[in-house]
Amino acid sequence: MPRSVTADASGSFLTLTFEDGSESRFHAIWLRDNALDPETRSPGNGQRLITIGDIPADTRISTALVDDGALTVTFAPEGKTVTFPGKWLKSNAYDTDQSSEVGRTSPDVETWDSSQPAPAFDWNEVQSDPKAKRDWLDAIARLGFAKLVNGPVREGALIECASMFGFVRETNYGKYFEVRTEVNPTNLAYTGLGLQAHTDNPYRDPVPSLQILYCLENSAEGGDSIVVDGFRAAERLRDEDPEGFALLAGNPARFEYKGSDGVHLRARRPMIELSPDGEMIAIRFNNRSSAPFVDIPFEKMEAYYAAYRRLGEFIDDPEMGVSFKLEPGESFIVDNTRVLHARLGYSGSGSRWLQGCYADKDGLFSTLNVLNAQLGG
């Protein structure tokens, strides 16, 4: 909670001192823009009701006081008085050290290697218990993957899985697709060959940010699923070869898919994507779908390929992958912007039948946020 406040003589900002002794400065224009009163924000949905042009350019702090854990500010020249909860100000403080490491991950993310057990949650518990659902979604948000076990063994059950948190993203493959051996397949995923760890559909813009794979049959020998944390692989490259990391993050790769029925998809994005302030936000890695790299300067191409090769070596490192075999009624979700998935080759004896679909993280995060608010998380 705030303990005291001091407004600068210019009125352009104030300094808030909290009970723990920490201090944060807030600008007048920022406070006015983020006012929580019903004339500025809709009480129903929190959406802003004013534009930046509605706020006077010379907005300044006329008075500021702390009382009962809240900050009350009067703005000139409007003469408008607004109260801000101290907890809200603490959680939204921006007067912090912004000089963070390039290539860092979000504090909400936990990177991992082969020592990470595959988190597993029960289908019925997730459907019936909000806390179990919250824990399931939280694992996907933190780790980038999780299993769901004891589900129904029926076609299309993965659609029910997606509806627990969001919506299926339909593509040219349909609402969902089959993953099993085919004669003359249009995609290598439909063969019995092993697949290198990869992210799906890098040739789409934007890529589907979640993938669900649901097992209906799995009596074939082999065919274990493997997941690899792309963020951890990129961290290893960054620590070993910062210049190589910068090349993969600072130059776009190209990805392409030509399928049947007139489908031709292209995208131009970096293999390692950073936010403007340097946070790692996405990995795209799919050797099968890589198009010729034509956006890297001639003098950097060999170094780019060396970094690409090294990233692939980290991804293929057995110490990086978590493996498991899905049983009928089991499924797993991966964050397709972070976690790569692979498959060991399987024999022609027995049968292996999975169904897959795509979804997006906005629905997952929305459901998780609502559950956290309800459960006090």
UniProtKB/Swiss-Prot annotation:
It comes from Leisingera caerulea. Fe(2+) binds at residues 198, 200, 341. GO terms for molecular function: gamma-butyrobetaine dioxygenase activity; iron ion binding. Belongs to the gamma-BBH/TMLD family. [2-(trimethylamino)ethyl]phosphonate binds at residues 187, 200-201, 203, 286, 288. Involved in the degradation of the naturally occurring organophosphonate 2-(trimethylammonio)ethylphosphonate (TMAEP). Catalyzes the hydroxylation of TMAEP to (R)-1-hydroxy-2-(trimethylammonio)ethylphosphonate (OH-TMAEP). Is highly specific for its N-trimethylated substrate. Cannot use gamma-butyrobetaine as substrate. The keyword Membrane does not apply. Gene3D superfamilies: 3.30.2020.30, Clavaminate synthase-like (3.60.130.10). GO terms for biological process: carnitine biosynthetic process. It catalyses: [2-(trimethylamino)ethyl]phosphonate + 2-oxoglutarate + O2 = [(1R)-1-hydroxy-2-(trimethylamino)ethyl]phosphonate + succinate + CO2. Its cofactor is Fe(2+); L-ascorbate. Contains an N-terminal homodimerization domain, a short linker region and a C-terminal catalytic domain. The N-terminal domain may function in substrate binding by stabilizing the closed conformation. Does not possess the N-terminal Zn(II)-binding cysteine sequence motif found in gamma-butyrobetaine hydroxylases. The keyword Iron applies. This is [2-(trimethylamino)ethyl]phosphonate dioxygenase. It is an enzyme of class 1 (oxidoreductase). Keywords: Dioxygenase, Iron, Metal-binding, Oxidoreductase. 2-oxoglutarate binds at residues 198, 341, 343, 352.
